């Protein structure tokens, strides 16, 4: 599954009422307010599995293939944001959420930094610096899979 979570929404921090699970998403509304709820695939699938536990074999969920050009899981972790005051905090929060997802049965993979053609990119290692630090697999165009 390729899940694109850009800056206008993000996966929330751990929700302790849900057994420490990353249970909700935040979405910035047109009026600037923040709405929190099950607005994306991750919390929707978690809600479904809570109601139908036999759906998930041994607690497994899905593989989330991340890109990195706008950041990870809606957090501004891309190097283009390195001069912003919240950059280090955003990276730490994204790493915590990524670990929470792993602990809850989700797998994380790299879908490259931004749908790069790895063999012809000017900077083919950019995905390693920006995405591979939270994943153990690479999925390219849904056809190739690599695990180190």
Residue ranges: model-predicted function:
Residues 2-148:
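Metal-dependent polysaccharide deacetylase catalytic core of the NodB/CE4 family, i.e.
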């Amino acid at each position: 599954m390729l899940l694109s979570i850009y800056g206008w929404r993000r996966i929330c921090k751990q929700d302790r009422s849900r057994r420490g699970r990353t249970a909700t998403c935040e979405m910035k509304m047109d009026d600037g307010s923040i709405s929190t709820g099950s607005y994306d695939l991750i919390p929707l699938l978690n809600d479904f599995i809570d109601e139908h536990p036999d759906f998930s074999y041994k607690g497994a969920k899905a593989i989330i293939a991340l890109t990195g050009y706008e950041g990870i899981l809606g957090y501004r972790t891309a190097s283009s944001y390195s001069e912003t005051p919240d950059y280090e905090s955003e990276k730490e929060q994204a790493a915590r959420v990524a670990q929470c997802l792993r602990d809850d049965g989700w797998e994380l993979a790299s879908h490259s930094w931004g749908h790069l053609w790895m063999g012809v990119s000017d900077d083919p290692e950019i995905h390693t610096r920006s995405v591979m630090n939270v994943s153990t697999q690479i999925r390219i165009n849904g056809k190739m899979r690599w695990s180190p």
